[in-house]
UniProtKB/Swiss-Prot annotation:
Keyword Metal-binding: yes
Upper lineage: Archaea, Thermoproteota, Thermoprotei, Desulfurococcales, Desulfurococcaceae
Binding residues annotated for Mg(2+) 1, in chain numbering: 66, 84, 86
Keywords of this entry: Hydrolase, Magnesium, Metal-binding
UniProt entry tagged with the keyword Magnesium: yes
Source organism per UniProt: Aeropyrum pernix (strain ATCC 700893 / DSM 11879 / JCM 9820 / NBRC 100138 / K1)
Name assigned to this protein: Inositol-1-monophosphatase
Catalytic activity, reaction form: a myo-inositol phosphate + H2O = myo-inositol + phosphate
Molecular function via GO: inositol monophosphate 1-phosphatase activity; metal ion binding
InterPro entries, per database record: Inositol_monophosphatase-like
Length: 267
């Protein structure tokens, strides 16, 4: 099994090069055409590119993604790659520059997420991590990450989500009146920026996120010393052997803020 740091480097290379491809293709008319289900030409082009890069870099790899699907074997020595080729596709297809590419690697036997990278398609550097080896912003290791932003990142585009998020916002603003609320359109990128402190609290209470959407970013938050929970304040569990929902996600570098967001602390 390849070590976590090598896998981090591969995840950075693959996510960054795919982000470059998407940047070069941006705003082309044909990219929004649906090829199957909810998969567009842009999704398919990016995923095919990722699959080719992964095979060139690693040889044997078990890929779990929306288009390719897949069920990984627990007895294989090949690492599992959880891939989201384009998070924030609505933004991307609308020529809005907030979207990202996510690649995470997991141990097929234990299910432990070992490494990953979230690369912005447009401005900014990838956020990456290797389990037990630290987290990185671009090529620099993030030392003692702490919250420096005042943004609460939320998602409310599902029935009931507005009410749930409103409670979280009210509790958090009771702690810090200067918190600002934003909903930007790429959950993976917002989680990644939570890992390095640019976003103070991430709260997606729609119960619709999948493992491929957040595996890399959740790993980064945890490696940077933050916490990631479900809507009940329990540590978020992420399966890695097939595409599956992980539900609602709350994250912060400050455990107290995450607890307040889900109603388990006082403000």
């Amino acid at each position: 099994m390849i070590d976590a740091e090598q896998l981090r480097r591969v995840s950075v290379k693959v996510s960054s090069e795919t982000a470059g491809l998407l940047r070069d293709l941006a705003c082309s008319e044909d990219l929004g055409r649906v090829v199957s289900g909810e998969t567009t030409v842009a999704d398919k082009r990016a995923e095919d590119y990722i699959l080719d890069l992964l095979r060139r870099e690693l040889g044997q790899v078990q890929v779990i993604s929306e288009e390719a699907g897949g069920v990984a074997s627990k007895t294989s020595d090949a690492p599992i790659a959880l891939v989201d080729p384009l998070d924030g596709s609505t933004n991307y297809l609308s020529c809005i520059t907030w979207c990202s590419v996510s690649v995470a690697f997991a141990d097929p036997r234990s299910g432990e997420i070992l490494a990953g990278s979230v690369a912005p398609v447009y401005a900014g550097m990838p956020v990456s991590f290797a389990r037990g080896k630290g987290c990185y912003h671009g090529g620099l290791k993030v030392e003692d990450p702490s919250i420096r932003g005042s943004i609460i990142s939320v998602y409310v585009d599902e029935p009931g989500a507005i009410e749930s998020v409103a409670g979280a916002i009210g509790r958090l603003k009771g702690v810090r009146r200067d918190f600002k609320v934003r909903s930007l359109g790429s959950a993976a990128l917002e989680l990644a920026y939570t890992a390095i402190g640019y976003i103070a609290v991430f709260a997606d209470l729609r119960a619709r996120l999948r493992n491929i959407d957040v595996a890399a970013a959740v790993g980064a938050v945890r490696e940077c010393g933050g916490v990631v929970t479900d809507a009940h304040g329990q540590p978020l569990r992420i399966g890695v052997w097939r595409v599956e929902r992980v539900g609602s996600v709350v994250a912060s570098l400050d455990e107290a803020l995450a607890r307040i967001a889900v109603g388990g602390g006082s403000g």
